[in-house]
A protein has these predicted regions:
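DNA target-recognition patches
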Residues: 15-18, 29-64
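Short, well-ordered loop/turn elements at secondary-structure boundaries
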Residues: 36-38, 73-76
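A generic structural signal for residues embedded in beta-strands
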Residues: 80-81
């Protein structure tokens, strides 16, 4: 463990503190033009890396076809990159989709706070 915490705290796996799920982009190739150009924000790993705390700026959007092969995540979801820019984090400020190169974490408020998890990963 990198840091000492109060002895009453217990080390937990992330999935014990909330929901952990992988982003979704089923269609191959992922860059198929017919998936893009709609109203649904699609966050890439570079967007997450560029965000300071909250993620609301995006470089691409999905249309209905793109959304159908993906998943929308709610604001407050912690995005953690697992490819290209590894372990970069940002909290969704708006609804949006992200590819399978990103993990989404939704904190159980009775167990932890998404900001704490973000800052712990970022340390």
């Amino acid at each position: 463990m990198r840091y000492l915490f109060p002895t009453r705290w217990k080390v937990q796996k992330l999935d014990r503190l909330g929901f952990v799920g992988r982003g979704r982009s089923r269609h191959r190739p992922r860059n198929e033009p017919s998936l893009y150009g709609g109203e649904y924000p699609f966050f890439q790993t570079g967007d997450i890396k560029a965000a300071n705390l909250y993620l609301s700026e995006y470089s691409q959007t999905y249309n209905e076809k793109g959304l159908a092969q993906s998943k929308q995540w709610e604001p407050g979801t912690l995005c953690i990159t697992i490819a290209a820019n590894i372990a970069e984090t940002a909290i969704l400020g708006i609804r949006g989709c992200f590819p399978d190169s990103v993990i989404g974490f939704i904190a159980d408020p009775a167990k932890t706070d998404v900001h704490f998890i973000k800052y712990y990963i970022d340390l």
